[in-house]
Amino acid sequence: MIFTLGWASLAAIFTFSIAMVVWGRNGDGSIDL
């Protein structure tokens, strides 16, 4: 349970980091959420 939760949180952080890098490169907030 804890192991699975750890991997899930790691994947979420990794995905969020990639999203922030892409959003930062756009620089104009063109992504609509």
UniProtKB/Swiss-Prot annotation:
GO terms under cellular component: cytochrome b6f complex; plasma membrane-derived thylakoid membrane
InterPro entries: Cytochr_b6-f_cplx_su8_sf (IPR036143), Cytochrome_b6-f_cplx_su8 (IPR005497)
Topological relation to the membrane, as annotated: Single-pass membrane protein
One GO MF term: electron transporter, transferring electrons within cytochrome b6/f complex of photosystem II activity
Predominant localisation class: membrane
Record keywords, A-Z: Electron transport, Membrane, Photosynthesis, Thylakoid, Transmembrane, Transmembrane helix, Transport
GO biological processes: cytochrome complex assembly; photosynthesis
Cystine pairings recorded for this chain: none
Transmembrane spans: 2-22
Annotated compartments: Cellular thylakoid membrane
Subunit (UniProt): The 4 large subunits of the cytochrome b6-f complex are cytochrome b6, subunit IV (17 kDa polypeptide, PetD), cytochrome f and the Rieske protein, while the 4 small subunits are PetG, PetL, PetM and PetN. The complex functions as a dimer.
UniProt similarity note: Belongs to the PetN family.
Function: Component of the cytochrome b6-f complex, which mediates electron transfer between photosystem II (PSII) and photosystem I (PSI), cyclic electron flow around PSI, and state transitions.
Protein name in UniProt: Cytochrome b6-f complex subunit 8
Gene of this entry: petN
